[in-house]
Amino acid sequence: MSKYHEIKELRVLLLKKEKDILICKTLKTPLLSNIEINKIIQVKVNKPSINKAFDCNDFWENTILYLLDIQMDKDDFFYPKIIVLEPDYLLDVSAIAECFQDYGTSEYNYLLSKLIPVNNNKHILLGNFANMVVDEIFSNPIETDFDNTFLKHFQSIPFEYTTCKDIDDKNDFLKFQADCKGHYVRIKSLINNNFKLLGINIDKVVLEPTFISEKYGIQGRLDILDFEEKEQGISKIIELKSGTPPFPDDGFSIKPSHQVQLFLYYLLISQANKLNIQEWEDKIHGYILYSKTIKNNLRHKTPSLEIIQEILNTRNKIIINEHIFLQDNIQKTEKLIFQINSENIIKKQIHNKFNDILATKINSLLETFIKSSEIEKKYFITYLNYVSYEHYLNKIGICNSSNEKSSGLASIWLNNLKEKQEKFEIIYDLIIHENKIDTKEQTIIFKKTNLKNQYSNFREGDICILYPKNENYENITGNQLFKCTIKSIQKDFVEVYFRYKQRNQLFFKSFGRKKKWALERDFLDSSFNTLYKNLFQFLQAKKITRNLILTIEKPRQNTNYQYNNLELSPEQNRIINKALSAKDYFILNGPPGTGKTSIIIKNLVKELKNSQKNILILAYTNRAVDELCDAINSSFGNSEHINFIRFGTELSTADNHRKNLLKNIIGNFSEQKMSRNLIRKIVDEQHIFVGTIASIGNNEHI
């Protein structure tokens, strides 16, 4: 092909496929004002040395594509080197990376991870601990030591430690603690000694920065980033891994999944810094930090265009599978489920013993599905399709190709400032009033400078994205983003809490005192991830449980409880008695204000609290949970004692119930007494547990 013209990128709508040609219509492309919109173009695919790595056979009409690094010939055919399917559907970098394993690459790994629950184990705890070590060393470089860091980690996730069967035995726990100390020593030494040798500016490092790309359809949170503007130097990425490198370890190789994760971070940083792939070698240095190995912990690698094409083609295949769920077709979804098997996932020769173990794990999903009855399969598939559609709306919202208005996460880059203003979906023109991000408070107080911000659709506890404002708010995804939570919101000020404490305020100060910032609401995948796994757990449940959920069997009754409270009406007594007499479940439905919480729940708790049975009380929203907490306290005569354990965070819990959070309960004990036995004792002494469905669902060990 003789090159005639080059175009950096295009956002297009796929109209029709004709063999190796995609007939597309150009759409408005962010930051590119010179693009002719609604122009019909022909895109050539499956071309050797250009884009043959991309399999476009299963692309569907009226889908969005993002084309990058495009060449045009004299006949006006477009030859993109990168083709991204449904770029507004952001996939986590780590989820894509899991498709690349030592035993082969397969998009079905994504579905496997999506559906099969992962039990709490020591490897997860160790990885979590290693990340805390980094946080502690950067935020408290002088005062940090292993004992305090290990204790702090235990206090931050006491339930996880107490319910982890891998370390239940004392000797196993001591071995785990020793492993943690080894990781601590190596991480601290690398940060204090090796980082300077790599040219990493410790004072400029940012922890856990978030980036999203509406071009590549990915989002990711890096562990450590030393960001340099394109003209000023080299950006350094450090991704921490507490697991093992490839076996056998040659001292420089990186596991496929870790390598892919690192390469996708290259994409995110290159977009933020406006780099082309030819500049990566000189402008980005990425490292995997293996904290388990004794030597050669830091391993560097730079991706090639061919590898990036392979990675993004796998991302496209994941999206194709997700689109099958959206069609709500039982036969198509069932056919896809049958593709999740060891033959499609294990593609390389591995040791027979390991192959057998791995195949058993992989095939467990399909085998469970096959053993299920027809009605159970249909229930599973129907809800899988339904949840997938809701998840899609959460990410992209309801939009069409003509105006592309979105109400999901994609609204951040698809909707303009005026549209966000009309829906009160943005707080903008904020300036920093007080910065405490480098203190234990981990907060910033912003002052509102625009009168249009008097009204907004935000409240305390909302999870948001914070980003530095440019002149027209159009380049949001070209910035580093901070995930935060609104701690308080007032007429003139808004205070936000950050998950990660930073070493200093240098990043924020680099923009100047008058720099303006914006807040928009974030959308989380975690609740949906729990729903997918719960669906598979339904197939694994006992037969009686499945039959009750499917209403094949009627809920059973115990003997008449004979409840009677002279202070209640006959109808209220009847309802409570039926609930107490139920063996399996009891459904109470009624409009707001009819006393479901203030009377029925309150008196049910009052009756059951002396039975020594554990009671789990759930609601959808934190506000509803707080109302339930009020009702529980009322059933105890508003005693000041700890009457229940509340699951959640400080910011999501009403002030008067924060003392019931487990971390605050154990905070009343001295550090010398802190132990798993203490946690068990606290939990055993309490019989009432309260939280949102999401908070309980995300913590299955509870």
Language model features by range: what are they?
Residues 1-25, 127, 131, 306-458:
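A helicase ATPase "motif cassette" and its flanking acidic/Ser/Thr-rich regulatory loops
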Residues 2-232:
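Metal-dependent nuclease catalytic cores that hydrolyze phosphodiester bonds in DNA/RNA
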Residues 21-23, 30-54, 391-544:
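Conserved ASCE P-loop ATPase motor domains encompassing nucleic-acid-directed helicases/translocases
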Residues 27-60, 202-316:
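Mg2+/Mn2+-dependent nuclease catalytic core
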Residues 106-109, 289-323, 455-577, 633, ...:
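Pre-ATPase regulatory/linker segments immediately N-terminal to the P-loop/RecA-like helicase/translocase core
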Residues 571, 582-588, 612-613, 687:
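Pre-Walker A (Motif I) flank of P-loop NTPase domains
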Residues 582-606:
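Walker A/P-loop
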Residues 605, 611-702:
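Conserved P-loop NTPase motor core of helicases/translocases
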